[in-house]
Amino acid sequence: MSESLRIIFAGTPDFAARHLDALLSSGHNIVGVFTQPDRPAGRGKKLMPSPVKVLAEDKGLPVFQPVSLRPQENQQLVADLQADVMVVVAYGLILPKAVLEMPRLGCINVHGSLLPRWRGAAPIQRSLWAGDAETGVTIMQMDVGLDTGDMLYKLSCPITAEDTSGTLYDKLAELGPQGLITTLKQLADGTAKPEVQDETLVTYAEKLSKEEARIDWSLSAAQLERCIRAFNPWPMSWLEIEGQPVKVWKASVIDTTTKAAPGTILEANKQGIQVATGDGILNLLSMQPAGKKAMSVQDLLNSRREWFVPGNRLA
């Protein structure tokens, strides 16, 4: 067995909680957990703890929830724990240089892409959006840049034609803890081999927005189908019909050309709603009108056939 490390864990969402859960059964000593402050959630806007806080408190771990790690007194919280290493997974706060240098072995981060591709906020979604054949996780040594640190360990997985950001998130939430435990063993043994990122291969995973998720019919059918999967479960691809937003859950590409203007409805039947795009035809299969549940196109046509008259154009 490798040396048992004193670990500070910093993370916030479910993705991070799955990594903390793996650490708890790894033989290492979790000396403190940092997570974002409780936030208002739900219709009642009740203050809700993060998934990481819920797990940490359930296991009796000390929890810290600073709004920022810039104030000296908050940095002292980290210093007082005398950690060997700080593990950061989707924490959501910037770690100042002073904090990065406090643990004996520094701070390591689990990132949801094969760096240097897709540095930034939305690596899982952007890998789908771009049509990448594979993605994975990178465990890296943190520095002051945005996902610029040396890479310690990588695990990859294929992206299938059915994957959404939701399914890919689950795959990487399985891979990440495996890579993390292996990396910690290497750090404890002194066998880790840091690899500098190739700056010529860098791409940036820009944040998603609801406006970007609005369907732009001038794009190709292939790109739109990828967007629909990349933006599922958030922010969800959508279009506007009679002034109300309609989310699109699933679509397919029909490999045929058309001379119809982008956005023109070509067919509407139980096989789907076929719409002309900038290149090819997009076949809408599952949609969700405002205030309703997601439904098959057949069910939607039964109640809203007037929305999808062939020859009409969608906005």
UniProtKB/Swiss-Prot annotation:
It catalyses: L-methionyl-tRNA(fMet) + (6R)-10-formyltetrahydrofolate = N-formyl-L-methionyl-tRNA(fMet) + (6S)-5,6,7,8-tetrahydrofolate + H(+). GO terms for molecular function: methionyl-tRNA formyltransferase activity. One of its GO terms (cellular component) is cytosol. Its EC number is 2.1.2.9. Keywords: Protein biosynthesis, Transferase. Pfam families: Formyl_trans_C, Formyl_trans_N. (6S)-5,6,7,8-tetrahydrofolate binds at S113, L114, L115, P116. The keyword Transmembrane helix does not apply. It comes from the Bacteria. InterPro entries: Fmt, Formyl_trans_C, Formyl_trans_C_sf, Formyl_transf_N, Formyl_transf_N_sf, Formyl_transferase-like_C_sf, GART_AS, Met-tRNA-FMT_C. Belongs to the Fmt family. Attaches a formyl group to the free amino group of methionyl-tRNA(fMet). The formyl group appears to play a dual role in the initiator identity of N-formylmethionyl-tRNA by promoting its recognition by IF2 and preventing the misappropriation of this tRNA by the elongation apparatus. This is Methionyl-tRNA formyltransferase. It comes from Escherichia coli O1:K1 / APEC.
